[in-house]
Each structure stands twice: as C-alpha cells, then as structure tokens.
Amino acid sequence: MSEKTEQPTEKKLRDGRKEGQVVKSIEITSLFQLIALYLYFHFFTEKMILILIESITFTLQLVNKPFSYALTQLSHALIESLTSALLFLGAGVIVATVGSVFLQVGVVIASKAIGFKSEHINPVSNFKQIFSLHSVVELCKSSLKVIMLSLIFAFFFYYYASTFRALPYCGLACGVLVVSSLIKWLWVGVMVFYIVVGILDYSFQYYKIRKDLKMSKDDVKQEHKDLEGDPQMKTRRREMQSEIQSGSLAQSVKQSVAVVRNPTHIAVCLGYHPTDMPIPRVLEKGSDAQANYIVNIAERNCIPVVENVELARSLFFEVERGDKIPETLFEPVAALLRMVMKIDYAHSTETP
C-alpha cells in the first residue's frame, strides 16, 4: 500500500467536508459562549437585581395571605420573572454557539457523517481510538485546562485576600462591589485563557484533518484519471485542442513570465508587468498532456519553469484563466517572481 505523503487536493478536501471532516475547535465555541455570558451579565445585572428585589418585596406582601393563594401568585410571578431574565440569556448562548461554528466551518451538510457506521460499535476500533493521538491530546488538554484554571482562580483569590479580610468592616454595598469585581476579573482571566487554548486547539485540529486527508501518489493519479473521464473535462480537452490548433495557447505561454508546475500533472502560466499587469494573472493552465505541452513551449522559449507543488495546485484549482491571483496567494507568487527576476538579472549580467 502506497504511503500517504501528498497533501490533499481540493476535491479531497471537499469530499472530507461532506463526511464531516472539518477544522473545528470546541474550545473556540466555549470561548464564544463565555463572551456571551459575560456580555449578558454586564448589561443585564441591574435588571436582574431589580427582579430579585421585586420578587422579595412581592413575597413579603403575601405573608398574611392564604397559603394556596400565595403559592399560586408567587409561582406565577417567579415564572414570569425567570422567563424574561433567561430568555435573552438562552438566545445569546445559542447565537454564540451557532455563530462560532459557522465562523469556523461555514455551512456544511455532512450527510455521510450522520449515517450509521459499523466501526462505531466495533470494540477493536473503539479500543484503538482510546489510545489514539487525538485521545492523548484531548487528555493532555483537559488536564492542562484543570491546572491552568485552578491557577487562575488561586491567583485572583490570593490577590483579593487582603480585601476579603476587610469585608466585615466594609458594609453590604461595599461587599457586593468587591465580589462583583472579583467575579468580573475571574471571568476575564478565563476568557483570555480560552483564547490561547482555542488558538492552539484549532491549529492542532487543522494539522490533524490535513494529516488524515493526505493522499498517496496513486490516489492523486487516480483522482486525475477520474477527472479526465468527466464530460466537462472531455469538453475542456476538445477546447484545448482547438486552442493548440489556433495557436492561442502557445501565445499565452510565450507571454508569461514564469510557469509553475507540480512535477507531472499541472502547469500554470503566470503573467506580470509592473505597469500593464501590476497584479499577476493566470494566463493559461493545464493538466497532464496539456501541462507537458505548456512546459515544452516554455522551455523552447526560455521561460522559467519553477516546480512548486503547493502553489501550482492552488493556482490551478482556485484561479480561472485570465483572472488575477487572489490576495491569499500574493506572498508565494511574489516570492516566485522575485526569484525569477533574480535569475533573469544574473543571466543578463553574465551575457557579454
């Protein structure tokens, strides 16, 4: 069985999304929920205190009333108060949860992930999962969270220790301010901690998903064969043959400043000019036989051919012919163009 050393293609990533293999961190979701709770208590604390005072006052007014009547009235009042108080809280937490998931993975309909899988009840498979890398990382992460949260709580209680000793001489209003200040800073400390944990966990999940979706060289070749059998690809091949016959493809290659390729399957022609084309464009691209044809034309016309697997794939799958490169590819394309220009300059200085 071939070793899986190749990075996943765009098609592989799309198929992974359909199966629920997306980069998602539960810690980031927890962070959004903590922020929602913090904002709720920050803006609605006074309202909650007023509701509490009204409830206590209403209870005292019912002291001399018959028990059944008082119980009914008090129950109705509590239900009404709790409903109004918790409605915004529940809505805020739900919005924060859904929003965090949407920001991480977008809209994903993973129908394959919902279906029944026999390995879920396979004891051997489940035993392996217990000792998998993911399980070890989750155990370490949980232990780290317990330790760090304990240290955060210990630090703030130690910091407020002298203030607590003065509370008996402070009065009720002062005590409420001290406790509310402690709770606020504890909450902020926990949120900062979850920001750090969320970034680390998201990075690990990204690494794990990419690792799980890696492909062997045979997988990549098979995927290209499958694409070649697609009707759209056949139509594109006929268009490519027409372009070759008309000379438009060769003309596009000759106008490019560099050709980026992955070793055998993909070739992309980049066009750039400081004034006429300040943002690089994909002038032409091709796969398999067309890629070899592009490389041959480039080599015959002394156009630099650079092998860069990641960049070639990104340009091929993300940018259409004639389109400008997206901002996400500015840096690698700029680095490639700088290298090509240095080579051209070195050749020009060496030529007598």
Curated annotation (Swiss-Prot):
Residue spans crossing the bilayer: 34-54, 89-109, 144-164, 176-196
Membrane topology: Multi-pass membrane protein
GO CC terms in record: plasma membrane
Primary location class: membrane
BP terms from Gene Ontology: protein secretion
Keywords (A to Z) from UniProt: Cell membrane, Membrane, Protein transport, Transmembrane, Transmembrane helix, Transport
InterPro entries assigned to the protein according to its UniProt record, in alphabetical order: BsaZ-like, T3SS_substrate_exporter, T3SS_substrate_exporter_C
Pfam families per the UniProt record, alphabetical: Bac_export_2
Localization of this protein: Cell membrane
Family designation: Belongs to the type III secretion exporter family.
Function: Part of a type III secretion system.
Protein name: Secretion system apparatus protein SsaU
Originating gene: ssaU
